[in-house]
Amino acid sequence: MAPKQTKAEKKIAYDAKLCDLMEEYGQILVVNSDNVGSNQLQNIRKGLRGDSVVLMGKNTMMKRSVRMHAEKTGNNAYLNLIPLLVGNVGLIFTKGDLKEVSEEVAKYKVGAPARVGLVAPIDVVVPPGNTGLDPSQTSFFQVLNIPTKINKGTVEIITPVELIRKGDKVGSSEAALLAKLGIRPFSYGLVVLSVYDNGSVFSPEVLDLTEDDLIGKFAAGVSMVTSLSLAISYPTLAAAPHMFVNAYKNVLAVAVETDYSFPEADKVKEYLKDPSKFAVAAVAAPAAASGAPAAAAKEEEKKEEPAEESDDDMGFSLFD
């Protein structure tokens, strides 16, 4: 039987393991492990086996190991992890796709009952319907002001009732009622808090961004740059076309109001002197467009008319 490790030996072994993982992996998910049991954690480890490693530990030990690794290797990128090691957290080192690993972790959430004193992570609403409880159990509902009626010898909840609000502590009456109804309102599992990718740290929401989201954000950014550039008259690639158009309009306006002229301005001046030309141009365009098909139709009719054959051309008549 192997001798039991001392605390000092355990710390040395933990430091070595964490440093080795940081050498091998460049991507890490920082996860919250509140209310996650050992069996559940074991299942998560099995599910991620192959390209990911789950490491739990005390925050002080993890922070110390990260600093030791930075001092040994001169690589300070992992120091960005230290501010994230707060609360009941663990690390998932991975070589796989971060989004896929995050989705795999989310699969291992399990339902849990509402325990007394637990802070509710979500709102808990009891749905209307028959509870299957006998009338002697109505006291639970009365204490919680839940409207009920007796239907076929059992208690029936009339309307949906918000029993517990997110952030509130679960009371003894709420816990007892949910247990009687067989409702397990909460689900627990590892929750991704932050993502570390080769020195960069970002929110897990970034993993859910699609190509369309990125295109939309890029387009919005270009639009903002264009608006700002136009507002302060600072030339940028995005604003240049609009600046040229605005400048041309300004030059055209000056030419119209003065004797200065150029071919395009002459045309505008001509229209301004005789506005009726606008109407003539507008009528002429549709007429020309409709005239072309009519002419083409006539040409087709001419082509399709068969040449009439005469009896004389045949060299004899019907009465010969």
Curated annotation (Swiss-Prot):
Ribosomal protein P0 is the functional equivalent of E.coli protein L10. Belongs to the universal ribosomal protein uL10 family. Phosphorylated. This is Large ribosomal subunit protein uL10. One of its GO terms (biological process) is cytoplasmic translation. One of its GO terms (cellular component) is cytosolic large ribosomal subunit. P0 forms a pentameric complex by interaction with dimers of P1 and P2. The keyword Ribosomal protein applies. One of its GO terms (molecular function) is structural constituent of ribosome. InterPro entries: Ribosomal_protein_uL10, Ribosomal_uL10, Ribosomal_uL10-like_insert, Ribosomal_uL10-like_insert_sf, Ribosomal_uL10-like_sf, uL10_eukaryotes. Residues 291-320 are annotated as: Disordered. SUPFAM superfamilies: Ribosomal protein L10-like (SSF160369). It comes from the Eukaryota. Keywords: Phosphoprotein, Ribonucleoprotein, Ribosomal protein.
